[in-house]
Amino acid sequence: MAILNELYPSVPYNVLAYTPPSFLPDAGTQATPADLTAYEQLLKNLEKGINAGTYSKAIADVLKGIFIDDTINYQTYVNIGLSLITLAVPEIGIFTPFIGLFFAALNKHDAPPPPNAKDIFEAMKPAIQEMIDRTLTADEQTFLNGEISGLQNLAARYQSTMDDIQSHGGFNKVDSGLIKKFTDEVLSLNSFYTDRLPVFITDNTADRTLLGLPYYAILASMHLMLLRDIITKGPTWDSKINFTPDAIDSFKTDIKNNIKLYSKTIYDVFQKGLASYGTPSDLESFAKKKKYIEIMTTHCLDFARLFPTFDPDLYPTGSGDISLQKTRRILSPFIPIRTADGLTLNNTSIDTSNWPNYENGNGAFPNPKERILKQFKLYPSWRAGQYGGLLQPYLWAIEVQDSVETRLYGQLPAVDPQAGPNYVSIDSSNPIIQINMDTWKTPPQGASGWNTNLMRGSVSGLSFLQRDGTRLSAGMGGGFADTIYSLPATHYLSYLYGTPYQTSDNYSGHVGALVGVSTPQEATLPNIIGQPDEQGNVSTMGFPFEKASYGGTVVKEWLNGANAMKLSPGQSIGIPITNVTKHNYQVRCRYASNSDNPVFFNVDTGGANPIFQQINFASTVDSNMGVKEENGVYVVKSIKTVEIPAGSFYVHVTNQGSSDLFLDRIEFVPKIQFQFCDNNNLHCDCNNPVDTDCTFCCVCTSLTDCDCNNPRGIDCTLCCQVENQLPSFVTLTDLRNITSQVNGLFAPGTQNRLAQNISDHDIEEVVLKVDALSDEIFGTNKKALRKLVNQAKRLSRARNLLIGGSFENWDAWYKGRNVVTVSDHELFKSDHVLLPPPGLSPSYIFQKVEESKLKANTRYTVSGFIAHATDLEIVVSRYGQEIKKVVQVPYGEAFPLTSSGPVCCIPHSTSNGTLGNPHFFSYSIDVGALDVDTNPGIEFGLRIVNPTGMARVSNLEIREDRPLAANEIRQVQRVARNWRTEYEKERAEVTSLIQPVINRINGLYENENWNGSIRSDISYQNIDAIVLPTLPTLRHWFMSDRFSEQGDIMAKFQGALNRAYAQLEQSTLLHNGHFTKDAANWTIEGDAHQITLEDGRRVLRLPDWSSSVSQMIEIENFNPDKEYNLVFHGQGEGTVTLEHGEETKYIETHTHHFANFTTSQRQGLTFESNKVTVTISSEDGEFLVDNIALVEAPLPTDDQNSEGNTAFSTNSDTSMNNNQ
């Protein structure tokens, strides 16, 4: 039994000891396939799994997200997953783990894949059919399935043999026979791709070529992945026979040729198909062309853009992945797209003259960084409609406001009663990812004076779904949506076009079609490099020049994942970059040019120019390494390897040549440069960071005829240990200075208490100096001093109310998804935390000190050391964020270590004449009387408040300072009293909202046990009727990506409803009786289709008497005496028939006639056979079906009559909501 005090206890959540505030997507919110953070988290898990040998578990989680949770798009995840291609992985390579991702049935995890799991090829078929605007024929299905079945068999053999080798300890532990078996499988797979790939795009029919291209793109990716493994892992597998150095050189040639071939093929087939659509003349042709572009982009072009990254010479294996951002935008097919019920799109003109950046389909579409959506303003008008002459809206115009301008599509209403306008405010942090619309296609019943031109798709209902699953209502009636357009996964609506219908009367000009611009979420992120992951790996980053802040002209490209920037002679372009980690980076540029062009390249860090020189960008026309696209052949050019400091900087590029230059992207490859053999200037560059846990192949290279004036270099992966040589103190003066500083850490006359003003960072500065004392000269002294410093550190930890103030206990902190701890910083002895730029996830750390740790009427000091910070907010709160400061701290360079001077930075004078350290912060917070019941404690957090901000912080402390004076006690009592009043007011409000819901959910379950079984008489409607309340604070006050206490309550409510719903689904004989999976499991006749009601519910709509759905069920352990109950919830006039019997057919008919949503039942049904066909039909006009269930009747009691009773209950406008 759930009771109020369990869900909403008198003591709020205990941050450290109890269940912590969980991340929003992990606690029952409506995660959507648009949420890029979910893909990033699953990708991190896969990366860890590949290196740890647990990748099958990571892939199982992905498959669950795809086929069970419906939060992951298969195609999108695979595409993002290819960024792992450059990882330094074990000898299994990258292809083996991906087999289980491409073919769900081959993922060797303990738990079987979801029962509805498909391979990626089968999962593509609905999109392919949508693209070619028809279903696949039986011959086409046979052809595609046969080819993929052959590949799956070969992949399974490859995987099985690799598993066998690994089970024996690896390639150096098995005999030559098993190695030969494996290499045979490798070569067989390679031959399959070489031989069979062309058959997918060589056919006499255009449709066959187009439908085969998505298969071709995936298969080409698989082949290039296999070839890369052969090149990088082949010498480990079999260096003597099949993968000798000469053979590897041959495979290198193959991968380069195939990258060009596969890219050209996809581009040529796409362009040929695109040309066949011509210039759209009406909405019908426009919709088909845009759908073709959308699916070809997400299923083909987005894969082809990654092909060059498979070349290990161009993108060598390191310990980090590769991230090449895409900025290309996609136009949706026009909305509405349904053509049933009399809506004809042929010959319906489309007017694009008012569309910014459209340029007849050849433009770049509105730049999402320049035009940020702010608001939609809708202008509806009203006409007589259904059900007793009620007025129904239709949309005349929509006004789109962005950060640049306001633009009107359509015209303001001139006829009929007018209402509105209605406003839809848009939150850029929670963008729109789905548009739901209803359109009139036939005159409503009883509508007098109806104008037939309004039959051509007038909008009568409109709403929008946001990324977090919440819905924005446009304030229009209609109640449901017959058109649902979901933007491609990980995209958002960055702009909205509209087009009017042109008619010959005064209804001309009303808006009937909307066109959305879909933009990848990463397109608006700042350009960040040097951000390490949890293992310290730094990714290679590539940013489209389309993200430049000035200069150049946007030109269309299809294969790059971004439009190119054309730089005419004399023009310049600048792109802003933020570097998180001071580091060496190889700066590269991908470009195309028809002739040689001198280019001035300037990397401007604001105080230096690591690159400031003219560089020749050679003609790429005849390049053997390039990929030909719309504006030329694109190649990657290395500019220079330089050290770039942490912070923001600009890259400026000026075309000083005489012909156009086309810039695709700029890349930053993290490097460490080691210098060997100073006499002959031989240098070795290796990818950073070095992973000393990996086993690398040693390649010996002889260099002869070295020219000391012209150093030569080699690129390789180097595994080594680099000793950090600290200075050594050898004089008695050094010893006296350091001894004095060690003694100064303690209060006078004791070594059991720290001095009053000593911070944790002070102790760490001293230990650096102690460690630098010479072992040979001062060994005994050093040991004694180090013992004292260790004692000081223990005392510091003991007084610190924070757990893990130097991050020795990282689990004690709440942190943003991308926040990491880092070691080996010149200013820190201990680990420090790196707060990176926020990106899609907030960047923070947070901890709460519980009330039980505090003393009454006491002042506490909150302090810490900041090595570097840009836009770092420091928040300390007890009664309401008493301390809230945003600080900027310059990058702290370590001074040469001396025995007397500071480690970092020259102290500056403060207002009271003392010396202060700009890197050290210290604040005070007062605690009055203790309040154990409400447990306010002291909450402490650091977070980044701007997109390009960052910080490195450590030595965080909350420690007791002194007792409060009398006047300070009075002040804090007044603040505490006000806080308690507001707290109790909100608590009373929340209690009044949640107690009724607790009571209703208790009523669903036997013995009111939310983890037990639901009662036998529970129906879908009982669950749907429970409307979750809108609580005032669902998100944590500081951690915006986590639930508050109230949010956790809502998650528990939703979890209990979900469990009840799942049990009901298991108990009913009908599959998908709630129509949550569209009309799956039902046979449709006529125009039965799903719509979305205004409250967000998805229901089945039967528009007239010619529409019906049916389902045949088979009862296990059939008993003709067993009784069943039919429960139906719907609106309108219709019937449910149940046909059963073998030799003699019996039909049971249940009639449902209700103007509002109502539950009706038929009890005590018996059947004459184990097969029953259930049919739902409309009798007259629109019939809306919310849910239907057929369940075993409970055993009757004495006062029950089961003679086919019929009952009903009315419940209009009810829903199961999860308000955010």
From Swiss-Prot:
GO MF entries: toxin activity
Location of the region described as Disordered in the Swiss-Prot/TrEMBL record: 1194-1220
Record-level GO BP terms: sporulation resulting in formation of a cellular spore; symbiont-mediated killing of host cell
Composition-biased stretches (Polar residues): 1198-1220
Keyword terms, alphabetized: Sporulation, Toxin, Virulence
Coiled coil: none
Domain of life: Bacteria
SUPFAM superfamilies, per the entry: delta-Endotoxin (insectocide), N-terminal domain, Galactose-binding domain-like
Function statement: Promotes colloidosmotic lysis by binding to the midgut epithelial cells of hymenopteran species.
Miscellaneous note of the record: Toxic segment of the protein is located in the N-terminus.
Sequence similarity: Belongs to the delta endotoxin family.
Protein name, UniProt field: Pesticidal crystal protein Cry5Ac
Protein source organism: Bacillus thuringiensis
